[in-house]
Curated annotation (Swiss-Prot):
The lineage of its organism: Bacteria, Pseudomonadati, Pseudomonadota, Betaproteobacteria, Burkholderiales. It catalyses: (R)-pantothenate + ATP = (R)-4'-phosphopantothenate + ADP + H(+). It comes from Paracidovorax citrulli (strain AAC00-1) (Acidovorax citrulli). Belongs to the type III pantothenate kinase family. Substrate binds at residues 96, 103-106, 183. The keyword Magnesium does not apply. Homodimer. GO terms for cellular component: cytoplasm. This is Type III pantothenate kinase. Its cofactor is NH4(+); K(+). Pfam families: Pan_kinase. It comes from the Bacteria. A monovalent cation. Ammonium or potassium. One of its GO terms (biological process) is coenzyme A biosynthetic process. It is an enzyme of class 2 (transferase).
Length: 254
């Protein structure tokens, strides 16, 4: 039974074909496409793939983009399933005031992180950071309850906001420095430390609430840029959303 996982973010669609809908399944093929080029999938990346038996995806880019993805899947004749956050799924309890309003990417990534944590050892609190166009910082207690999370602009959005709202800041991308001595480095360092500070504050909240140090995981396309600037060790995971989709699929499609 083959399984297609799809993650439709704000700028790109990422996909992976697995040999089974369960954690630990082998990857048969994978790829990514910018949202502007979704219509290429059926005739290019997906053209030589066998029809998946099952499909599960999450989308944050809106219904119009989701419909475009479904059109590319029509020739496979496989039912499409999309994650909508609920009160509880795959061992994670949703603490959001209105569970269905939580971003599906956040929900799926947290499920992936929780399952990865339990495979590694005993349950403990968890902080999950997803670094992309936007940055999310989630807190989960040892019992598997999502306590709440932060949303803040990603590094690119911060820089564009400063460039558009401030005269004279159209400068090349700089480096992260302890004591920046030019505008490029000051902008890059400021954005990086703003994100790192939000993460550190959430970690402290979890310690105060749960009474113990949380495990810390980071994912997302820009995670590798942030990891060296964190004040504590983070496990850098390539794609927690795919891991979450596999965990959900194992329960839904068994």
């Amino acid at each position: 039974m083959t399984f297609l996982a799809i993650d439709v973010g704000n700028t790109r669609l990422k996909w992976a074909m697995y040999d089974a809908p369960k954690p630990g399944a082998a990857v048969l093929a994978h790829g990514a496409e910018f949202l502007d080029h979704i219509e290429r999938l059926a005739d290019s990346a997906w053209a030589g793939l066998p029809a998946p038996t099952r499909m599960l995806g999450c989308v944050v880019a809106g219904d119009a983009v989701r419909r475009r993805v479904m059109e590319q899947m029509e020739w496979w004749d496989v039912p499409s399933h999309w994650v909508v956050p609920s009160a509880e799924e795959a061992g994670l309890v949703n603490g959001y005031d209105h569970p269905t309003r939580l971003g599906s990417d956040r929900w799926v990534a947290m499920i992936g992180a929780r399952h990865r944590l339990l495979r590694q050892g005993p349950a403990r609190p968890l902080v999950v950071v997803m670094v992309g166009t936007a940055v999310t910082v989630e807190a989960i207690d040892a019992e598997g309850r999502f306590l709440g999370g932060l949303i803040l602009p990603g590094h690119g959005i911060m820089l564009r906001a400063l460039e558009s709202g401030t005269a004279g800041l159209h400068v090349p991308t700089g480096e992260v420095k302890l004591f920046p001595t030019n505008t490029s480095d000051a902008l890059t360092s400021g954005g990086t430390y703003a994100i790192a500070g939000a993460v550190e504050r959430m970690v402290q909240h979890v310690i105060q609430h749960c009474g113990e140090e949380p495990a810390c995981m980071m994912t997302g396309g820009a995670g590798w840029k942030m990891a060296p600037s964190m004040t504590r060790p983070f496990d850098l995971i390539e794609n927690l959303i795919f891991e979450g989709l596999l965990a959900i699929a194992a329960e839904r499609f068994r």
